[in-house]
From Swiss-Prot:
UniProt domain comment: The activation loop within the kinase domain is the target of phosphorylation/activation by upstream protein kinases. The PPI motif mediates the interaction with the ABI (abscisic acid-insensitive) phosphatases.
Protein name: CBL-interacting protein kinase 17
Residues at the active site: D136
Catalytic activity: L-seryl-[protein] + ATP = O-phospho-L-seryl-[protein] + ADP + H(+); L-threonyl-[protein] + ATP = O-phospho-L-threonyl-[protein] + ADP + H(+)
Organism of origin: Oryza sativa subsp. japonica
Entry keyword set: ATP-binding, Kinase, Manganese, Nucleotide-binding, Serine/threonine-protein kinase, Transferase
Induction: By drought and salt stresses and abscisic acid (ABA).
Lineage: Eukaryota, Viridiplantae, Streptophyta, Embryophyta, Tracheophyta
């Protein structure tokens, strides 16, 4: 913590200097007291969010970051709230923006530009594979860490699969003018993947050449240049770099190179080492927790027993929190359910394993959790369908079972959850996939009862 920069303790975090400010609040440096870890806490003013009608944007950013776990995407670790503020605990990236780096040092060498572009494409491609389109990619939203590696940030304008129209295309104009794809400006449907690729091409141009490919003080003239793809690519760039830029900055999206084409391009392939996403089970993310009072800061999860949930966490998991308006998602129960059970953890794990095995799943036992895997049709990957199972102790006779899908078909996930919850004495499937109130669950805790769906 920087001297003179200490502030009040906040739910287990010691707050420090302000890193930046935006429309809805500020971002502060924070240190986690239990681990000493460094984080960036985005503090949003709920009144400001409501007055600017930005609830959907904030909700979208949270919902998006919950899905993404990749070395080149900024990680969301925790979300909490008070009556007046929303707190997003994010990965701390201490190298600043790519924009600042280029503004200060100028254009990058082809070798360095290629390395960063490979990381950018790895991160963006990972997002696309999960149905997430950024829609506002620019150097200001690409951070650089202390080791010189990039992290994609600011997913407030991103789109998820449920935002697609009946034609399978996106229809909302988003993004920054200089980086926006021509098809997005036409107010017609557009492919989110191809529009993101265009923005990546503009970023590559800026990295290698040092200025924008499309720029003009007059916004109409700027848009005309973008529509025409009217830009000059210097001859001093290597032939293969020129070729890739032209293929990305193709104004006709039907002719534009796609993600697979970029990854197989000779310029991109040089010294390319693909980066693997994080294991989805590496670390869980906590959502919906009410901001602890100052005297509660030592009551942190995992201090004494990684299997136990304290009363504060239990309240945070319930659906009756003020946060519901920000964190509810119609698709969320298709990825994770939790229900209460009276079975001891060992017996619960045995029952889960038995139910999953009978349905043809492979079961791997790890520390305090099970991994349930099944090969789906058309895939040779044994992890093409994967669900993790955990059991948390609420008390001597009440536990919480969590089933969380990492990959795979929602219908198969629903079938698996129905079987396991039924075998453990829970209520019917429709109730399992609905969010129940905390009070009802505690009153019915003698049987397996759904507690919440995150």
């Amino acid at each position: 913590m920087v001297k003179g920069g200490r502030e009040a303790l906040l739910g287990g975090y010691e707050m420090g200097r302000t890193l930046g400010e935006g429309n809805f609040g500020k971002v502060k440096y924070a240190r986690h007291l239990a681990t000493g870890g460094h984080f960036a806490v985005k503090i949003l003013d709920r009144g400001r969010v409501v007055s600017l009608r930005a609830g959907d944007q904030i909700r979208r950013e949270i919902a998006t970051l919950k899905l993404l776990r990749h070395p080149h995407v900024v990680r969301l670790h925790e979300v909490a709230a008070s009556k007046t503020k929303i707190y997003m605990v994010l990965e701390f990236v201490n190298g600043g923006e790519l924009f600042e780096r280029i503004a200060v040092k100028g254009k990058l060498s082809e070798k360095e530009g290629r390395r960063l572009f490979q990381q950018l494409i790895d991160g963006v491609s990972y997002c696309h594979d999960r149905g997430v389109y950024h829609r506002d990619l620019k150097p200001e939203n690409v951070l650089v860490d202390q080791k010189g590696n990039i992290k994609i940030s600011d997913f407030g304008l991103s789109a998820l699969p449920q935002h697609l129209g009946n034609d399978g295309l996106l229809h909302t104009t988003c993004g920054s003018p200089n980086y926006i794809a021509p098809e997005v400006l036409q107010n017609k449907g557009y492919d989110g993947s191809l529009s993101d690729i265009w923005s990546c091409g503009v970023i590559l141009y800026v990295m290698l050449i040092g200025y924008l490919p499309f720029d003009d003080r007059n916004i109409v003239v700027l848009y005309q240049k973008i529509f025409k793809g009217d830009t000059q690519i210097p001859k001093w760039l290597s032939h293969s770099a020129q070729n890739l830029l032209r293929r990305i900055l193709e104004p006709n999206p039907m002719k534009r190179i796609d993600m697979a084409g970029i990854k197989s391009h000779e310029w991109f392939q040089k010294d390319y080492i693909p980066v693997l996403p994080y294991d989805d089970d590496d670390e869980d993310v906590q959502f919906g927790a009410r901001l602890p009072a100052k005297e509660q800061i030592n009551d942190e999860p995992g201090d004494k027993n990684s299997h136990q949930i304290n009363a504060f966490q239990l309240i945070g998991m319930a659906s009756s929190l003020d946060l519901s308006g920000f964190f509810e998602d119609e698709e969320v129960s298709q990825r994770r359910i939790r229900f209460t059970s009276t079975h001891p953890p060992k017996d619960a794990f045995d029952k889960i394993e038995s139910s999953a095995t009978e349905l043809g799943f492979q079961v791997q036992r790890g520390h305090s959790k099970l991994k349930l895997m099944r090969n789906c049709k058309g895939s040779k990957n044994p992890e093409s369908f994967m669900v993790s199972a955990e059991v948390f102790e609420l008390g001597p006779s009440v536990n919480v079972v969590e089933l969380r899908k990492s990959n795979g078909d929602p219908a198969l996930y629903r079938q698996l959850c129905e079987r396991i919850s039924s075998d453990m004495g829970a209520r019917n499937t429709e109730q399992i996939f609905a969010t129940a109130s905390l009070e009802d669950d505690l009153q019915n805790s003698n049987a397996g009862t759904p507690l919440f769906a995150l």
